[in-house]
Amino acid sequence: MEDIKSLIAGVDEVGKGCLFGPVFAAAVILSKENEIELLNQGLKDSKKLSHRQRHNLVPLIKTNSIAWTIGQASAREIDVIGIRDATEKAMLRALEKFSSPPDLILVDGILPIRLWPGKQKTQVRGESHFASIAAASVLAKETRDELIKRLARKYNCYGLEKNKGYGTEIHRTNLIKEGATKLHRKSFISRLEIN
């Protein structure tokens, strides 16, 4: 059993720039052996992986990690507290699900998690530098995409099954025609002159 003090979690978010739905974050703790196994299975920056590759990596990440967690912040929370605070809230929710806090967290990007009481390191393009951040990126993206795919059945005029909530032309056009749902980020779409 590894010493709990040696545990390092990679953290990443997805969905910050979307017009629809929550922002998701994942945190993943990997051993050196886990890292090697996942890298050999094709783990890398989620943006460089196809949907099928990411989808196939999810069970491998879950079974080849010491621990993994998911957190989210709703569209309403984003509207009330802003995207940066909501993103941090999603990350904190993921991190707080670990049975013991990691000794160090590796955060993708330049901004630290302000309310995290422990040690942290930020890294621009972190998913290209740390396997744990790459794994967190894959879990967050696939988990959010699955939710949006389910919601697309109910809110079918916005093209969500393809755009995953991002502001594509069909999404923006139908927001103007049909109006926003309760899952749209009102603070993000106010410039589109939507009711």
From Swiss-Prot:
The keyword Nuclease applies. GO terms for biological process: DNA replication, removal of RNA primer; mismatch repair. Its cofactor is Mn(2+); Mg(2+). Residues 6-195 form the RNase H type-2 domain. A divalent metal cation binds at residues 12-13, 108. PROSITE patterns: RNASE_H_2 (PS51975). One of its GO terms (cellular component) is ribonuclease H2 complex. Endonuclease that specifically degrades the RNA of RNA-DNA hybrids. HAMAP family: RNase_HII_B (MF_00052_B). NCBIfam families: PRK00015.1-3, PRK13925.1. This is Ribonuclease HII. The gene is rnhB.
